Amino acid sequence: MLVNFKLMLQKAKLGKYAIPHININNYEWAKAVLTAANQANSPIIVSVSEGALKYMSGYSVVIPLVKGLIESLSVKVPVTLHLDHGSYDACIQALQAGFSSVMFDGSHLPFEENFNKSKKLIEIAQKTNASVELEVGTIGGEEDGVIGQGELANVDECKQIASLKPDALAAGIGNIHGIYPKNWKGLNFPLIETISKITNLPLVLHGGSGILENDVKKAISLGICKLNINTECQLAFAHEIRKYIESNKDLDLNKKGYDPRKLLKEPTQAIVDTCLEKIDLCGSRNKA
């Protein structure tokens, strides 16, 4: 059964830990993420971007896939199925299809338009008991074609968006999607603390891959309650595929090394291992 993330983030905020949000890209990803969460007894947010949703052939595939895996793997922990960086229309479609949570990314819009669409979306989400994450200040890097420069969120705008009472707030705090460049300035900790105090909302750290562990832990102590991970899982997956191919295992005809199930076994385990590392970094182990 899918749940919204309202209660899990409220508990995380009180307990000063975070909930891992892991983007999935296919069947192996979904299975690995749910396996890790169940193994660690951790609540989990299974997330899909619009691009991944299209790649996986849409809502009619993704929702039954996740629900089916929850049942077949006997997953006992709370699971949220979340649309990541959705447009207004995509969020409505996701809610109608059965997602238990959506993130409306209106950060690239004029603030008034972002505010008004956010307000309408929250009203719609309440009808299906779904959670809503909103964004103020564009996150750096690229996410499904949307490019942000890593700007810092306007505190007054954060306060206004918080008045809508979303379940989580993603604010630009110097974070970047993808691999962090060597000249990255780092997270703006004073801004995280300020936004947390004035909004009293669970805050979200997008672009969580590649940030120093101590910095992530400090951010969590200041109010980050949801850590978004994608790139690190992709890198771990690709690394294991490269190892398999470069060792010529795919050319072993006697052992049927060309079997995709054998090719994907270690890469899938690498996602499980990465998720377990992030669960421990977040402090969500045994918090289900």
Curated annotation (Swiss-Prot):
SUPFAM superfamilies: Aldolase. Keywords: Glycolysis, Lyase, Metal-binding, Zinc. Its EC number is 4.1.2.13. Pfam families: F_bP_aldolase. Transmembrane segments: none annotated. D-glyceraldehyde 3-phosphate binds at residue 49. The keyword Cytoplasm does not apply. One of its GO terms (biological process) is fructose 1,6-bisphosphate metabolic process. Zn(2+) 2 binds at residues 105, 135. One of its GO terms (cellular component) is cytosol. GO terms for molecular function: fructose-bisphosphate aldolase activity; zinc ion binding. Binds 2 Zn(2+) ions per subunit. One is catalytic and the other provides a structural contribution. Dihydroxyacetone phosphate binds at residues 178, 207-209, 228-231. Zn(2+) 1 binds at residues 85, 177, 206. The active site is at residue 84. It catalyses: beta-D-fructose 1,6-bisphosphate = D-glyceraldehyde 3-phosphate + dihydroxyacetone phosphate. Pathway: Carbohydrate degradation; glycolysis; D-glyceraldehyde 3-phosphate and glycerone phosphate from D-glucose: step 4/4. It is an enzyme of class 4 (lyase). Its cofactor is Zn(2+). Belongs to the class II fructose-bisphosphate aldolase family. Catalyzes the aldol condensation of dihydroxyacetone phosphate (DHAP or glycerone-phosphate) with glyceraldehyde 3-phosphate (G3P) to form fructose 1,6-bisphosphate (FBP) in gluconeogenesis and the reverse reaction in glycolysis. Homodimer. This is Fructose-bisphosphate aldolase. It comes from Mycoplasma genitalium (strain ATCC 33530 / DSM 19775 / NCTC 10195 / G37) (Mycoplasmoides genitalium).
